[in-house]
């Protein structure tokens, strides 16, 4: 069994790798939203994608989701949960540094709850007869244009509209508080 302790980031998503012996690599992404930890994970062997899992862990109410990973068996998810309160939309907006009207706060609470419920619905999808694939659109990869740098012709016009310039860089406002740097 593999146990992963909680990892907290102040913003954004966390991506981590975990090797569990052999040639399997477990990769997971997780997001923290107002005390709710959403995650998506998959296990990949050297030959193909093995399993995909979605879930959530609530830290504000009695809700627990545990996943057991076995090389020989599919993932098994055990859940014990209770109805949890809607996320604090005002706090989420403050963390994202966006302003919301009282009407928007009222509208977004149920919508965020629906997203969390959607993760639960994904657990019920039967994928036993689905061929493993890393990408769903492998045919489109051959149609991509070559990745070649392009020189912008009107650079001086673009630079003229920049408020602060420290050659050769464009200076932008800080987005993190000084205590977080």
UniProtKB/Swiss-Prot annotation:
Provide the catalytic activity annotation: L-glutamyl-tRNA(Gln) + L-glutamine + ATP + H2O = L-glutaminyl-tRNA(Gln) + L-glutamate + ADP + phosphate + H(+)
Check the record and name the InterPro entries matching this protein: Asp/Glu-ADT_sf_sub_c, GatC
Q: Does the keyword Nucleotide-binding apply?
A: yes
Under which EC number(s) is this enzyme classified?
6.3.5.-
Work out whether the entry's keyword set contains Transferase.
no
Task: Quote a single Gene Ontology cellular component term.
Answer: chloroplast
According to the UniProt entry, its GO molecular function terms are: ATP binding; glutaminyl-tRNA synthase (glutamine-hydrolyzing) activity
Alphabetical UniProt keywords: ATP-binding, Chloroplast, Ligase, Mitochondrion, Nucleotide-binding, Plastid, Protein biosynthesis
Q: What else is known?
A: This protein may be expected to contain an N-terminal transit peptide but none has been predicted.
Q: Could you tell me what this protein does?
A: Allows the formation of correctly charged Gln-tRNA(Gln) through the transamidation of misacylated Glu-tRNA(Gln) in chloroplasts and mitochondria. The reaction takes place in the presence of glutamine and ATP through an activated gamma-phospho-Glu-tRNA(Gln).
Q: Hey, which family's this protein in?
A: Belongs to the GatC family.
Quaternary structure note: Subunit of the heterotrimeric GatCAB amidotransferase (AdT) complex, composed of A, B and C subunits.
Protein name in UniProt: Glutamyl-tRNA(Gln) amidotransferase subunit C, chloroplastic/mitochondrial
